[in-house]
Amino acid sequence: MALLEICCYSMECALTAQRNGADRIELCAAPKEGGLTPSFGVLRSVREHITIPVHPIIRPRGGDFYYTDGEFAAMLEDIRLVRELGFPGLVTGVLTVDGDVDMSRMEKIMAAAGPLAVTFHRAFDMCANPFNALKNLADAGVARVLTSGQKADAAQGLSIIMELIAQGDAPTIMAGAGVRANNLQNFLDAGVREVHSSAGVLLPSPMRYRNQGLSMSADIQADEYSRYRVEGAAVAEMKGIIVRHQAK
């Protein structure tokens, strides 16, 4: 049966995903940055209270995936922490300035991760040649690749995703970016074995007093009075589609 991974940005989101049938969680912070390394407090709380597999993301900042030596050193320390806390896997990605997988740094990441399953995240979609990148990641021992097929969303990139799946069984290709209940069946019919979804919704902040003339964000257009949450009904609907597909 296809595996459903849900991207979560808090303990509350992780609990919602687990209750509604998620098979695995990618744990992140900072949804507006596309996901950054969670804090120690969030990592520890989730490790203690969530029973399904959780893979934290290791990403020190938003933007591109070419990191300074200092940023990369911090990533290795975060990997060691995730390993010490007992998580079964992690999610990360590093590129060279030319858009190739940084194999030298991936070797260090794999050594630091040890027995943990490593997912190479959507840095893959920023690679110059996805097929060369996949071969390199297979050589590195990466367990899976999260990809939209190098398109804005996975529905647009499905043909490339299918080509990547045809390359072989390792790493597993996980489709993500815009995967929802209304298009999930297309991925299942195409033979995608793992899917990744945010299943997210923005809810209004409970704050009654709002200083509309002041922003705490560098982006003055940012809505600071909305909060990201995983929508339990969306997770349950996707899990139901997967179960029915398996029963065919």
UniProtKB/Swiss-Prot annotation:
Q: Which domain of life is it from?
A: Bacteria
Q: Under the GO molecular function aspect, what terms does this record hold?
A: copper ion binding
Q: Which is an annotated Pfam family here?
A: CutC
One term under GO cellular component: cytoplasm
Location within or outside the cell: Cytoplasm
Among SUPFAM superfamilies, the record links this protein to: CutC-like
Per the record, the coiled-coil ranges are none
Where is it predominantly found? cytoplasm
Keywords for this protein: Cytoplasm
Under the heading NCBIfam families, the entry gives: PRK11572.1 (NF008603)
| Recorded family membership | Belongs to the CutC family.
Q: How does it assemble?
A: Homodimer.
User: Which PANTHER family does the protein's record reference?
Assistant: COPPER HOMEOSTASIS PROTEIN CUTC, COPPER HOMEOSTASIS PROTEIN CUTC HOMOLOG
The protein in question is named PF03932 family protein CutC
Q: Which organism is it from?
A: Salmonella typhimurium (strain LT2 / SGSC1412 / ATCC 700720)
